[in-house]
Amino acid sequence: MQEIEIFCDGSSLGNPGPGGYAAILRYKDKEKTISGGEEFTTNNRMELRALNEALKILKRPCRITLYSDSQYVCQAINVWLANWQKKNFSKVKNVDLWKEFLEVSKGHSIVAVWIKGHNGHAENERCDSLAKLEAQKRVKTTT
């Protein structure tokens, strides 16, 4: 299995409000950056959207280390998700995105590593800036 690193971040102005996401995929010395957003969303949804969109790019099963400043995403992947499935996602927020995650993560081995946000982690800072930029693009202005 190829070893891949994924760094992701999500942003929401207002939470909920205009949101953006960004992810960096790294395999050896190759990198791919993706970003996007939605007009009305939350930071947790954008963080998860970043991960799902990154996973969709991968063509074969990989061993993935995910780096995120979202304890919600890291804890869900490492701890909560199996139990959520057993309980049919009862009382779980963002069920649509978690079910999508289960689909796009099939075949992959994923370990999520929490990193402190805004703490000088280069890839996290890049994702944070891109996600904020994507969110700002979706702010509606009144004239």
Curated annotation (Swiss-Prot):
Mg(2+) 2 binds at residues 9, 128. Residues 1-136 form the RNase H type-1 domain. Mg(2+) 1 binds at residues 9, 47, 69. Binds 1 Mg(2+) ion per subunit. May bind a second metal ion at a regulatory site, or after substrate binding. Its cofactor is Mg(2+). Belongs to the RNase H family. This is Ribonuclease HI. It comes from Helicobacter pylori (strain ATCC 700392 / 26695) (Campylobacter pylori). InterPro entries: RNase_H, RNaseH-like_sf, RNaseH_domain, RNaseH_sf, RNaseHI. PROSITE patterns: RNASE_H_1 (PS50879). Endonuclease that specifically degrades the RNA of RNA-DNA hybrids. GO terms for molecular function: magnesium ion binding; nucleic acid binding; RNA-DNA hybrid ribonuclease activity. Monomer. One of its GO terms (biological process) is DNA replication, removal of RNA primer. It comes from the Bacteria. Gene3D superfamilies: Ribonuclease H-like superfamily/Ribonuclease H. It catalyses: Endonucleolytic cleavage to 5'-phosphomonoester. It is found in: Cytoplasm. Keywords: Cytoplasm, Endonuclease, Hydrolase, Magnesium, Metal-binding, Nuclease. Its EC number is 3.1.26.4. GO terms for cellular component: cytoplasm. The gene is rnhA.
